[in-house]
């Protein structure tokens, strides 16, 4: 029996049998024997460095040929650095990137024998690699006796390679599309998207037309006495008369104008008219085109009260401002302002209950100066004249004498050769007193003072040099 199993080929496995060891079996049996050097016991899994090959080339190196998209390999640990634990997972076309957390593999319930890590192949170079469907589950032993550093051991890991099929996603999408498709009443009729869009567009147009037609009909459906309106009559506004210009005098309508508008009916409004039709109650009525209305004896007074309000000033709205503007000189405006200010603005207290107090007239000179723009009187003169300051000022004389005495005493104590500074001091004060106290004069005075200080400093330096020598 053992001899028959020994000669049995891997390709001739019975239908239904597959090489699918569990995670615990991969570590406790296959990985343990490979690390300890028992290669003959694990010939079903080939040893290969996955970083030297691309993922789409690895399925051809599998010992067991299978139609399933899963392949197992022993992979030696390729350290990226000799003294580190980081592995080199880069290939020519891309790199393997670890994702997620390491999952523990237990033997029983508590004994941890290894970990499983997920790697995803990215085409290109980090960090701009493109994720692919090639995935590896890396199985690593965590027990101390399988560290791979003991005598007779070699560090290995088991890599389970598999590829996610894109067809699965396509089938799921097709199923979702079938669910989302709307129900059709007749399964034999096929309607394309273009036809549906055309139907929707035509329905929108019809609804729009119906809305427009309803606007035309809605105004006529409740009227029995008026003629039917058409769309052209509703839209055409050209029959409206043009608005006349308002450049004319406004006035209350005269009785003649009211009579021309009302015709013969106006005669019935007069108190002495005999065109009223009486009834048993001695009430008067007037016949108009809209029926009969009761009228009062003093209907004319009532019309006057409507056409002209008693509270309004009859002269207030007599004229309307004509179109355009006239250019008026400033002098004329000032004259108008003076005239307007002198007018008494008193109103009829009995009508409005408000009395407006008149404003006092302003002097003509001030008005003229205010109207004239850009002339001198509107400007403020900030410059002052200090011509009265001269050398006869006692304060300047005292300052001059004090400065002369101070400089003279210091020079006499140091050296008699420096007496010429007195002349310099006098020259400086002459310049200062001759300069007017203006902005430019102050600047020139500052310059002279600086020159004076520089001369004093130079004389002091010369004196010290002569004293040292």
From Swiss-Prot:
Alphabetized UniProt keyword annotations: Activator, Cell membrane, DNA-binding, Membrane, Nucleus, Phosphoprotein, Stress response, Transcription, Transcription regulation, Transmembrane, Transmembrane helix
Tissue: Expressed in roots, rosette leaves, cauline leaves and stems.
Nucleus as UniProt keyword: yes
InterPro entries for this protein: NAC-dom, NAC_dom_sf
Entry's Gene Ontology molecular function annotations: DNA-binding transcription factor activity; transcription cis-regulatory region binding
Cellular component terms (Gene Ontology): nucleus; plasma membrane
Start-end of DNA-binding region: 113-170
Function: Transcriptional activator activated by proteolytic cleavage through regulated intramembrane proteolysis (RIP). Transcriptional activator involved in response to cold stress. Mediates induction of pathogenesis-related (PR) genes independently of salicylic signaling in response to cold. Binds directly to the PR gene promoters and enhances plant resistance to pathogen infection, incorporating cold signals into pathogen resistance responses. Plays a regulatory role in abscisic acid (ABA)-mediated drought-resistance response.
Protein name: NAC domain-containing protein 62
Organism: Arabidopsis thaliana
Organism classification: Eukaryota, Viridiplantae, Streptophyta, Embryophyta, Tracheophyta
């Amino acid at each position: 029996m053992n001899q028959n199993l020994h000669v049995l080929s891997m390709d001739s496995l019975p239908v239904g049998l597959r090489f699918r060891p569990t995670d615990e079996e991969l570590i406790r049996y296959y990985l343990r024997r490979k690390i300890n050097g028992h290669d003959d016991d694990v010939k079903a899994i080939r040893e290969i460095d996955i970083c030297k090959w691309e993922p789409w080339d690895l399925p051809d190196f599998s010992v067991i040929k299978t139609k399933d998209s899963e392949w197992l390999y022993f992979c030696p640990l390729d350290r990226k650095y000799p003294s580190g634990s980081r592995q080199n997972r880069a290939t020519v076309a891309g790199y393997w990137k670890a994702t997620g957390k390491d999952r523990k593999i237990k033997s029983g319930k508590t004994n941890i024998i290894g970990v499983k890590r997920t790697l995803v192949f990215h085409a290109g170079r980090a960090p701009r690699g493109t994720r692919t469907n090639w995935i590896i589950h890396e199985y690593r032993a965590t027990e101390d006796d399988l560290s791979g550093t003991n005598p007779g051991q070699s560090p290995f890991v088991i890599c389970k390679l598999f590829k996610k099929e894109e067809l699965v996603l396509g089938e799921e999408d097709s199923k979702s599309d079938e669910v989302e498709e709307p129900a059709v009443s007749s399964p034999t009729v096929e309607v394309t998207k273009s036809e549906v869009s055309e139907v929707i567009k035509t329905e929108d147009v019809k609804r729009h037309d119906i809305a427009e037609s309803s606007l035309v009909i809605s105004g006529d459906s409740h009227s029995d006495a008026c003629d039917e309106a058409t769309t052209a009559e509703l839209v055409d506004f050209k029959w409206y008369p043009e608005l006349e210009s308002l450049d004319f005098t406004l006035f209350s309508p005269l009785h003649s104008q009211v009579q021309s508008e009302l015709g013969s009916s106006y005669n019935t409004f007069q108190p002495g008219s005999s065109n009223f039709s009486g009834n048993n109650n001695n009430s008067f009525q007037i016949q108009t085109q809209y029926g009969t209305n009761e009228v009062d004896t003093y209907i004319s007074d009532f019309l006057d009260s409507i056409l002209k309000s008693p509270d309004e000033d009859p002269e207030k709205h007599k004229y309307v401002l004509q179109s355009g503007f006239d250019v008026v000189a400033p002098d004329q405006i000032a004259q108008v302002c003076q005239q307007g200010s002198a007018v008494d603005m008193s109103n009829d207290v009995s009508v409005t209950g408000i009395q407006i107090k008149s404003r006092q007239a302003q002097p003509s000179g001030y008005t003229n100066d205010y109207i004239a723009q850009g002339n001198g009187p509107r400007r403020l003169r900030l410059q002052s004249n200090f011509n009265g300051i001269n050398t006869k000022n006692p304060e300047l004389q005292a300052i001059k004498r004090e400065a002369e005495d101070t400089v003279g005493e210091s020079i006499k104590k140091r050296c008699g050769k420096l007496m010429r500074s007195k002349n310099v001091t006098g020259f400086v004060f002459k310049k200062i007193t001759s300069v007017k106290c203006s902005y430019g004069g102050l600047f020139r005075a500052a310059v002279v003072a600086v020159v004076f200080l520089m001369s004093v400093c130079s004389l002091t330096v010369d004196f010290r040099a002569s004293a040292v020598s």
